[in-house]
Amino acid sequence: MGEREELVETLDKHRGLLRRTARDLTDEQAARRTTASELCLGGLIKHVAAVEARWARFITGGAAAMRGGQDGEWAEQFRMAEGETLAGLLAGYEAVARGTDELVRSLPDLDLAHPLPSAPWFEPGVSWSARRVLLHLIAETAQHAGHADIIREALDGAKSMG
């Protein structure tokens, strides 16, 4: 297995861990906050899907392609909105994942890079390659899968990763 497939496989493993935290839940349970945090399981899935989609756009179009999903919309990424369902959020996440995987497999080179957008959390003048973006997505997804596991355990005692 080559580097590209290893990265896709690792990202997909962590996606699966995140999805597993939502197994057998109702929409109401997926929308419920169970800790002092604002986070809920449905909102985490929604957020991770949005972040992955934005970074996939970065890979192909650079920082300008990442616009959207900022400011007021940012906080809403962590909540299930009226009318959203867990099944719908999971289907949306699956579609984003398929798109990212297809993109990665189609890239001529993982060294394709773009300058990062201007933001307080990015060092000025730094560029990220497609490879670096994938590493970031793996870390982001794994971190949020851990958050989701805590939320799920607080919800009904179920553990998805332990």
Describe each PLM feature range.
Residues 4-22, 27-76, 116-162:
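Short, contiguous alpha-helical
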Residues 1, 5-8, 80-90, 124:
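Charge-dense, low-complexity intrinsically disordered segments
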Residues 76-115, 131-138, 142:
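Acidic/histidine-rich alpha-helical segments that form the ligand environment
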